[in-house]
């Protein structure tokens, strides 16, 4: 967070304000909340790190030796409130449950249900005791479907808002403060502005503190800034940016070693962490792409239903029906258009995919996020722990004037090696192992060295593991060469020195040193080459400088190593004084350089390459140093070999950056300080203009601004991260992806998905599954909607031609919630038709889940053939029973007259009302069976949208089971005794099953020919009109 940018003083806490201003300028709550959120997005104004100690003391009215008085502290606590984070307003569980019951598709089904109850009510009031109860049953079933599906969805997604709870777990419980000159342990809630606080290794920092004294203090800022290495702290202001200066320690970060004393400059919500917490909890998430698609689908279905309903309402009035009958028809047509089983089908399909993804280490917290990942067009990825292994590892060595590469892979299996027989390596390894404060935690002997946990900072731990693996057990080395004196590393000296007794001469001592390479070289007057000592010369200094620049340019942390065999007068028992040096610290012998980096994960380069093939832009957004960020970006392929930054081109051509042509720049590394001064238009221009982008040294607010910039340009954005600093961006993203192992609780709560193995490569798997489920949902919806036409047309012809009802309401329910359900769900198991990772991400504005082409295919083509099959069977059965098709026209009023028991058929036979109804229900059963038979073909053709079935094959076992299940269920509904009473379904003659079979074959042949033409003439008329 950079100073110098004027913001409202919302982050400024006053230790001694005299009164609280009343809020006379009252604004509407929503506007005020939006304004507060915009303030939180801005960088914090802070100048405490620049103040002298006297100015600091005066600003906070505190004695820097004795601290605040107990009375003053109590006054400030009363005025400013406790040092806690304000919990956000949480959504009650009952509201979440209601959203599942009444949101999206459920609303359509509730409308259908209410219309059914209305129709039944009208029937009851008109027909009294003879009222048809079909609409009552349909209304009850629709309500039950919504409630059961809603409960299922709520159960799948049930998660309380625990974002602030996870922040609370990060807050330390006790703090050591100095008040009235006395040290006292107090509850962290009671820490106030201006308090003098002491922090030691192992403590969590209780507030934002300006350091006034420190001894070897290092803090782990990784959760805030993304820096993977502990940062040293001292009283001096070392940077304009308060996040980068060394004299401030932040609330909830960990002090890993040393001690520090300082003055509290911010508490609770006003701390950097508090602002992130407020920002995260204040953000609202937009609709997921799949929610938008379902809303679009509802609009289409509603429009079709209302259009048909209103059209036939007026048509029925024209044909002479009463207005009461016309209203009943209107309601019936609208309800018939509602695909009752689709809500359950979509929910189950998403759930199945979520479970499949969980087996591949992608834990989805929100079902709709399953598809969102497939729609992703931009991934904003954190570096530390996501693209990298989150462990410092030795990457290169430089000794004997040669750079050697070490094995940085997670499995240590690349076989990279270096000359371990060199005497120089013998010295270098001993210095790295002995002049080292890191150690292995006990009882880990059975674990591989790379998997063992250590005590000590990241760089020393990396050296410890490397020496243990490449040289010899460090513990044995330390036993044989006991340490007798030490000067720990500090930011002023920039070196660490230790003195040891020699293994082969127990009376002599050796002085070992490591640290910043330029400092180490200053101590040296000689150097080792192939184990021999030579005087330091200009050639060696030039070689050293070149190696240092090369390794530093790779974004690696470079350390220099040297030693000195102390003269014989420093024999065993000599009392070394490290305060007032009584031993030589010059004329040391330079041994070499070792560089370390947090290396990329093995699978990441391949994953980034797959993302690029899939048309997904991968942007690195990190708090780490630009050189390190750029090096990792190049090693994983975020910046590809073919593309160069302006700096790369300038260096290659030996020209200034201003002379580089903008057309030749394809990649860019943007520093947080540059981003701070950009407006949204400039940021948008960078996001549009460059293919490969790295943002380095970014603050949490800037990460959020980058995500919002991508979304402004129409991208579906996925954000990956593991730290607290990532949580605002994770929540704002279309899909937030947190790390399961290294991720903080806060990031996991803010995210929609968790990578259980912390592997960026798992995201590619998730994208593939997301794209596949979108394709398969299209197929499921196409299959489900097709049967709507043979369900609606009987009702329409019943009105227009006044024939006996060909298909009843109960039978429609048996299709939608019975025979169609398992086959529709089985399409979720369908394998992709082609490499779905080779195509561009779908355009949410044009590539809809349900489009006019899908509706045209389902309703206008396949659905019509299915309706013909049903009517053919219907008319065959009635003809066999004596009623020829032409004689059925206009017969409905007589057919449904309960008092007419001598209705004559075509041949003069008389039929009672009961006999007519048995034939009618038999026809309805046959119509139902016909739909099942033509749905066989529909299911098979829905397996693919472009490929031939003969290429795709019938390997989907769940789909084969679905075919068998719907056939057996249809047979059971027809032939089980009692169904004539329960569902008005009657047994059929076997030959009536075959009436629809030719239509089923016709559907299959028609669709295979259509797909063949589409494949032969890509982009042609047929593809434009029918490829959904």
From Swiss-Prot:
PTM-bearing positions, type Phosphoserine:
948
Enumerate the residues binding Mg(2+): 722, 726
Residue numbers on the Extracellular membrane side: 114-137, 315-326, 798-807, 872-923, 976-990
Q: Please list where the region (Interaction with phosphoinositide-3 kinase) is annotated.
A: 87-89
Protein localization:
Cell membrane
State which residue ranges cross the membrane.
Answer: 93-113, 138-158, 295-314, 327-344, 778-797, 808-828, 849-871, 924-943, 957-975, 991-1011
GO biological process entries: establishment of localization in cell; fertilization; flagellated sperm motility; intracellular potassium ion homeostasis; intracellular sodium ion homeostasis; potassium ion import across plasma membrane; potassium ion transmembrane transport; potassium ion transport
Could you tell me one molecular function GO term of this UniProt entry? metal ion binding
**What broad class describes the main subcellular location of this protein?**
membrane
Q: Which residues form the active site?
A: 382 (4-aspartylphosphate intermediate)
InterPro entries in the record: ATPase_P-typ_cation-transptr_C (IPR006068), ATPase_P-typ_cation-transptr_N (IPR004014), ATPase_P-typ_cyto_dom_N (IPR023299), ATPase_P-typ_P_site (IPR018303), ATPase_P-typ_TM_dom_sf (IPR023298), ATPase_P-typ_transduc_dom_A_sf (IPR008250), Cation_transp_ATPase_P-type (IPR050510), HAD-like_sf (IPR036412)
As its record notes, the protein acts as a catalyst of: K(+)(out) + Na(+)(in) + ATP + H2O = K(+)(in) + Na(+)(out) + ADP + phosphate + H(+)
Q: Which domain of life is it from?
A: Eukaryota
Q: What class of enzyme is it?
A: translocase
| Spans annotated as Disordered | 1-36
Enzyme nomenclature, EC number = 7.2.2.13
Pfam families to which the protein is assigned, alphabetical: Cation_ATPase, Cation_ATPase_C, Cation_ATPase_N, E1-E2_ATPase, Hydrolase
Q: Which CDD domains match?
A: P-type_ATPase_Na-K_like (cd02608)
* Keyword set, alphabetical order: ATP-binding, Cell membrane, Ion transport, Magnesium, Membrane, Metal-binding, Nucleotide-binding, Phosphoprotein, Potassium, Potassium transport, Sodium, Sodium transport, Sodium/potassium transport, Translocase, Transmembrane, Transmembrane helix, Transport
Q: Which GO terms describe its cellular component?
A: cell projection; photoreceptor cell cilium; plasma membrane; rod photoreceptor outer segment; sodium:potassium-exchanging ATPase complex; sperm midpiece
| NCBIfam families for this protein | ATPase-IIC_X-K, ATPase_P-type
Q: What does this protein do?
A: This is the catalytic component of the active enzyme, which catalyzes the hydrolysis of ATP coupled with the exchange of sodium and potassium ions across the plasma membrane. This action creates the electrochemical gradient of sodium and potassium ions, providing the energy for active transport of various nutrients. Plays a role in sperm motility.
Give the quaternary structure. Answer: The sodium/potassium-transporting ATPase is composed of a catalytic alpha subunit, an auxiliary non-catalytic beta subunit and an additional regulatory subunit.
Name of this chain's protein: Sodium/potassium-transporting ATPase subunit alpha-4
Query: Origin organism of this chain?
Result: Rattus norvegicus
């Amino acid at each position: 967070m950079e100073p110098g940018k004027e913001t409202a003083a919302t982050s400024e806490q006053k230790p001694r304000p005299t009164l609280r201003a009343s809020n006379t300028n009252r604004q509407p709550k929503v506007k005020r909340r939006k304004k507060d959120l915009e303030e939180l997005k801005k960088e914090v104004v802070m100048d405490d790190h620049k103040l002298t100690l006297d100015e600091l003391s005066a600003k906070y009215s505190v004695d820097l030796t004795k601290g605040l008085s107990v009375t003053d502290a109590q006054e400030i606590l009363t005025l400013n409130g406790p040092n806690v984070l304000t919990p956000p307003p949480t959504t009650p569980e009952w509201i979440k449950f209601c959203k599942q019951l009444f949101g999206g598709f459920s609303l359509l089904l509730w409308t259908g249900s209410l219309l059914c109850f209305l129709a039944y009510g009208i029937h009851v009031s008109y027909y009294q005791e003879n009222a048809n109860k079909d609409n009552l049953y349909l209304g009850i079933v629709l309500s039950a479907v919504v409630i059961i599906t809603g409960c299922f969805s709520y159960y799948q997604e049930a998660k309380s808002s625990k974002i602030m709870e996870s922040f609370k777990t990060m807050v330390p419980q006790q703090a050591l403060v100095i008040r009235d000159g006395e040290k006292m342990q107090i509850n962290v809630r009671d820490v106030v502005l201006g308090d003098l606080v002491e922090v030691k290794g192992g403590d969590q920092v209780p507030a934002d503190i300006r350091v006034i004294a420190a001894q070897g203090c290092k803090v782990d800022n990784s959760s805030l800034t993304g820096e993977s290495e502990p940062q040293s702290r001292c009283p001096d202001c070392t940077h304009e940016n308060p996040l980068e200066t060394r004299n401030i320690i932040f609330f909830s970060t960990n002090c890993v070693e040393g001690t520090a004393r300082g003055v509290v400059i911010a508490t609770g919500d006003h701390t950097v962490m508090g602002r992130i917490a407020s920002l995260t909890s204040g953000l609202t998430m937009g609709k997921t792409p799949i929610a938008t698609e379902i809303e679009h689908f509802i609009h289409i279905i509603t429009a079709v239903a209302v259009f048909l309903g209103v059209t036939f309402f007026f048509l029925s009035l024209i044909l002479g029906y009463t207005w009461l009958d016309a209203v009943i028809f209107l309601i019936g047509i609208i309800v018939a258009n509602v695909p009752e089983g689709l809500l359950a089908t979509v929910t189950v399909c998403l759930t199945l995919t979520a479970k499949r993804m969980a087996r591949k280490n992608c834990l989805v917290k929100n079902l709709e996020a399953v598809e969102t990942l497939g729609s992703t067009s931009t991934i904003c990825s954190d570096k530390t722990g996501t693209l990298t292994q989150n462990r410092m590892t030795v990457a290169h060595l430089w000794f004997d004037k040669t750079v050697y590469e070490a094995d940085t892979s997670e499995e240590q299996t690349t076989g990279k090696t270096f000359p371990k027989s060199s005497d120089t390596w013998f010295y270098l390894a001993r210095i790295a192992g002995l002049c080292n404060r890191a150690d292995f935690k006990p009882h880990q002997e059975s674990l591989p060295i790379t998997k063992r946990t250590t005590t000590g900072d990241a760089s020393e731990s990396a050296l410890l593991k490397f020496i243990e693996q490449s040289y010899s057990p460090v513990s044995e080395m330390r036993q044989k060469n006991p340490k007798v004196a030490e000067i720990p590393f500090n930011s002023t000296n920039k070196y660490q020195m230790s003195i040891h007794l020699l293994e082969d001469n127990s009376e002599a001592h050796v002085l070992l040193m490591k640290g910043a390479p330029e400092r180490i070289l200053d101590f040296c007057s000689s150097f080792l080459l192939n184990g021999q000592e030579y005087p330091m010369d200009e050639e060696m200094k030039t070689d050293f400088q070149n190696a240092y620049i090369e390794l530093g340019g790779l974004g690696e942390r470079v350390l220099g190593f040297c030693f000195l065999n102390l003269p014989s007068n420093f024999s065993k028992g000599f009392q070394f004084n490290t305060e007032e040096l009584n031993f030589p610290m010059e004329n040391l012998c330079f041994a070499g350089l070792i560089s370390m980096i947090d290396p990329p994960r093995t699978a990441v380069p391949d994953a980034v390459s797959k993302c690029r093939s899939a048309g997904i832009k991968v942007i690195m957004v990190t708090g780490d140093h630009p050189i390190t960020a750029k090096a990792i970006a190049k090693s994983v392929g975020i910046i590809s070999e073919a593309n160069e930054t302006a700096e790369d081109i300038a260096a290659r051509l030996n020209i200034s950056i201003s002379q580089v042509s903008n057309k030749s720049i394809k990649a860019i590394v943007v520093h947080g300080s540059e981003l701070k001064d950009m407006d949204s238009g400039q940021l948008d221009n960078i996001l549009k203009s460059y293919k490969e982008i790295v943002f380095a040294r970014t603050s949490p607010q800037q990460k959020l601004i980058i995500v919002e910039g991508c979304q402004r340009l129409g991208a579906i954005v996925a954000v990956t991260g593991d730290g607290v600093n990532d949580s605002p961006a994770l929540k704002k993203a279309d899909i937030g992806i947190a790390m399961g192992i290294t991720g903080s609780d806060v990031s996991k709560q803010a995210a929609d998905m968790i990578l259980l193995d912390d592997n960026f490569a798992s995201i590619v798997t998730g994208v593939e599954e997301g794209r596949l489920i979108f394709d398969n949902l299209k197929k499921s919806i196409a299959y489900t909607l097709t049967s709507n036409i043979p369900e609606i047309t009987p009702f329409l012809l019943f009105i227009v031609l006044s024939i006996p009802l060909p298909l009843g309401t109960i039978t429609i329910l048996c299709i939608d919630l019975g025979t169609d359900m398992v086959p529709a769900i089985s399409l979720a198991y369908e394998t992709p038709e082609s490499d779905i990772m080779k195509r561009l991400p779908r355009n949410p504005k044009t590539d809809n889940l349900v489009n006019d082409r899908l509706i045209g295919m389902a309703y206008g083509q396949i659905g019509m053939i299915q309706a013909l099959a049903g009517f053919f069977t219907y008319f065959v059965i009635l003809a066999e029973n004596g009623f020829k098709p032409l004689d059925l026209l206009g017969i409905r009023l007589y057919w449904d007259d309960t008092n007419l028991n001598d209705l004559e058929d075509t041949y003069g036979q008389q039929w009672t009302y009961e006999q007519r109804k048995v034939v009618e229900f038999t026809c309805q059963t046959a119509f139902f069976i016909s739909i099942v038979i033509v749905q066989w073909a529909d299911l098979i053709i829905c397996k693919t949208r472009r490929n031939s079935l003969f290429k795709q094959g019938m390997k989907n076992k769940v789909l084969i089971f679905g075919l068998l299940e719907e056939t057996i269920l249809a047979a059971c509904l027809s032939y089980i005794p009692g169904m004539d009473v329960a569902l008005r379904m009657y047994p059929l003659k076997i030959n009536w099953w075959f009436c629809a079979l030719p239509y089923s074959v016709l559907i299959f042949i028609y669709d295979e020919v259509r797909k063949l033409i589409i494949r032969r003439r890509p982009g042609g008329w047929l593809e434009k009109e029918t490829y959904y």
